[in-house]
Amino acid sequence: MLILTSNGLTSQEILDRAAPYLSGKRCALVTTASVGFKQNDKNIPRHTRELLACGASGVELFDFDEQSPAGLTAYDAALLIGGNPYYLLHSIRTHGFAQPLRELSTKGTLIGVSAGALVLTPSIAVIDAFTPEMNQHVGLTDKTGLSLCDCEILPHYSKFLTRFDRFEERAQEYERQNGVTLHRLNDGEALFIGA
């Protein structure tokens, strides 16, 4: 099961739909994308509460930069928190986590939040249209995601409409140039793939 979210399991509808896939499961809370904060990310308590509300038997912090791919296989589910999608994708590739994440998406439950969701799709290139500076210190040239689904997403849609100049126009331009349809996800929304 693959669950792509804008800001986590933040609505009752998402919690209710996710519960059957998380009940009794041991979950890894992957902090890698939260560059500079990681285990101190302010959203960790909320994500932990949400996973436990879905019946998870336990939630443990996990960092691709510090732990092994084999370690991830010990979990039934994982939630990749938001942060820097360029850094997260680079870390997944550098440390060999692509295959364990693929396996988890088919044998267990894999949840992506914002950047954590973007890396699971075919491409993170849409971020270049809005915040390319996030790639400044990473220098990622290949924006190909893990392609665990065949859709691309645009998280935090309604929030970013007022934050970025010509946001919708730029999103449509990306769609035209790349021949894709972006699934616009507002906070509190999710895509369930494989349900």
Regions found by a protein language model. Give the residues of each.
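Short histidine/acidic/glycine/proline-rich micro-motifs that form metal-
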Residues: 33-38, 85, 157-161
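Bulky hydrophobic/aromatic packing residues
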Residues: 35, 43, 50, 56, ...
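Structural detector of well-ordered beta-strand residues that form the stable sheet scaffold
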Residues: 3, 111-112
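Active-site-adjacent pocket-lining segments in enzyme domains
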Residues: 80, 89-109, 116-195
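Detector for Asparagine
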Residues: 7, 40-43, 84, 135, ...
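N-terminal beta1-alpha1 cap of cysteine-dependent amidohydrolase-like domains
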Residues: 1-77, 81
